[in-house]
Amino acid sequence: MKLIHKYQMNGFNIVMDVNGGAVHLVDDISYRILDFYEEKTLTKIIELLANEYEKDKVIDAYNELKELENEGLLFSIDEYKDHPSFVNRQPVVKALCLNVAHDCNLKCKYCFAKQGDFGGRAELMPLDIGKKAIDFLIERSGNRRNLEVDFFGGEPLMNWEVVKELVKYGREKEKPAGKNIRFTITTNGVLLDDEKINFINENMHNAVLSLDGRKDVHDGMRPTVNDKGSYDIVVPKFRKLVSQRPKDKYYYVRGTFTRDNLDFSKDVNHFYDLGFELTSIEPVVDDESNPFALRDSDLPMIFKEYEDYAIELAERQLKGEKNKFFHFTIDLNQGPCVIKRITGCGAGNEYVSITPNGDIYPCHQFVGKDEYILGNLNDEEIEIPEEIKSMFREAHVYNKEACQKCWNKFYCSGGCHANAINFNGDIKQPYDLGCQMQKKRTECAIMIQAKLMTQGQ
């Protein structure tokens, strides 16, 4: 299926070739011609635009578009569906989410983990389960060399000694197995101290720091267990960690915006004011029965907020500022591999989550839903049910009706499986509100690149 997407933003006429990935900046006449290009003859297009453009200019612009099409840069065919790397893929486990703590010292109002215990009892992962998880990852990773382990929760710092021992264990096991394990930790920062900061900065390839933005916004959504604000507790610790972080390691400050702060660009700018250059702020995902949940009626304001902030960020980057916003980061020259573009996160096949008692789930969003348990690390033989593996493996953009004609499918890769199931009861029916926001973020990201390429040094 040949697809393009065109839109206008910040003075640019942007045209995307969906299948090939080419992005074009075109003049007004070419932009108008594309309204009719597929369905009308050149003669008819000349007639339709007679009151707007001279005949010769229409012909010239049309011929330029036709040349792009002939070169495979516009209305290109889809070569991914039958690509050998997709058709013949044999996924192996390459990433673990280790829920080392089903407990938390905050009680965030939007928490999908139900304040850390995922709807069960509070518990911490024993060291032996963590070691079995790393063994499982190494054994199931096939020829894959680079592996990922994310210490998650709940709040992983509540099980700090086990985290340290598991890093040590991973380092002991990786070289003999010919692997390279990259560790990540996601933390709310409450328990950070100098010892933990030093260890994280030395051993964690990435650190995800949970902060929602301005003090009133953060404290309103992320109170402590005794209903006090947590902003003043965590911000100084995060600033210290980031100021001491080695340049060869990553971090990002990650927030969540809700209906209470639809002006979330102010929260992102607050991150920058605090000295955090690498940021992300995610839309809350929750049922509309919660007053802070996003609704379709919020989309116009959210779209405007994204677009206004993209224009601002482009200007900042033109001035040499290093601020980066995760959702506006895009590589137009060398993006994700074919499989990643089509299948997304790999949950249930390439990525799994492990709970403190050793249960294996497709990802952390499914923890607590017994029907999605893939096995347990204490089983003598771990045989992940083929039915569940297949369900996730086949949940790619070509099997999702809403994705097949969508221009954004190779950027969002079909969206979040958990959101599809939670909102629609069907892994092949994407969460529409999330789709709409993702489309706007992609448009903004490409506009920023257009601005930098045309006006940068």
PLM region spans:
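Hydrophobic faces of well-ordered beta-strands that scaffold small-molecule active sites
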Residues: 96, 147-149, 183-185, 207-209, ...
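Non-cysteine beta-strand/loop elements that form the S-adenosyl-L-methionine
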Residues: 197-215, 277-285
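Short Fe-S-cluster ligation motifs
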Residues: 134-152, 391-392, 429-457
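Conserved alpha-helical substructure of the radical SAM core
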Residues: 52-67, 71-198, 203
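Radical SAM enzyme [4Fe-4S]-AdoMet core and its adjacent flexible, acidic
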Residues: 216-235, 239, 243-347, 371-373
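Acidic, low-complexity/disordered tracts enriched in E/D and polar residues
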Residues: 1-37
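Cysteine-cluster motifs in flexible loop/terminal segments that predominantly coordinate metals
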Residues: 393, 397-444
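C-terminal accessory region of radical SAM enzymes
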Residues: 301-334, 364-413
